[in-house]
Amino acid sequence: DEALERTIQSWAQKGIKSTFVDKGGHTWSLERYVRTVLKSTLGNTYDKLRKDRMSEYDVHTVLVTSHMGARKACSKIQGHVADLRESVSSNEKYKSIYDPYWGAEYGTAGGHRGINCNHLHIPFIPGINTNNQPKIDAKENEKVAELTKRQRQLERQVVKFKKNQMVSEALDHT
């Protein structure tokens, strides 16, 4: 009975394993993988539709939304207007979103608009639109990002303990 209970506890902790292993060597649970894929796919689909419509009207500039606690790859570009074209002439008012100046790693999983990035690209027409995004202090942003990361770790621990409690109660070991 003890071996069975240990096995059930172990399975409950690990969840349903996927074969996905990230660059850090962490194996993702199926639940985490599905949640991440659905969130990213929905955001990317909406973003692509918006940008397709923008290109129909020859609009290439976007206002990048800003929020406290943004990842490092997003911290410099957020709250600024950027040009979506890969290369723009040096006399253009707005830098390309791909410009190394931003350090945004745009188009990569861990970069700006990558996995779990919540930034939006709002169509921006120079001379018509205004930048209404709040400017965020880089040091404060980094501090909040670290605190948010720690909060997520604590939330995962709470979920783990609740799973243990549910399994124990189901096995009548409260």
Specify the residue positions occupied by each region the protein language model found.
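An acidic, gly/pro-interrupted, aromatic-rich
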Residues: 122
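Long, His/Glu/Asp-enriched segments that create or flank divalent metal/ion-associated functional microenvironments
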Residues: 115
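Domain-core detector
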Residues: 1-112, 125-174
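Catalytic core of tubulin tyrosine ligase-like
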Residues: 119
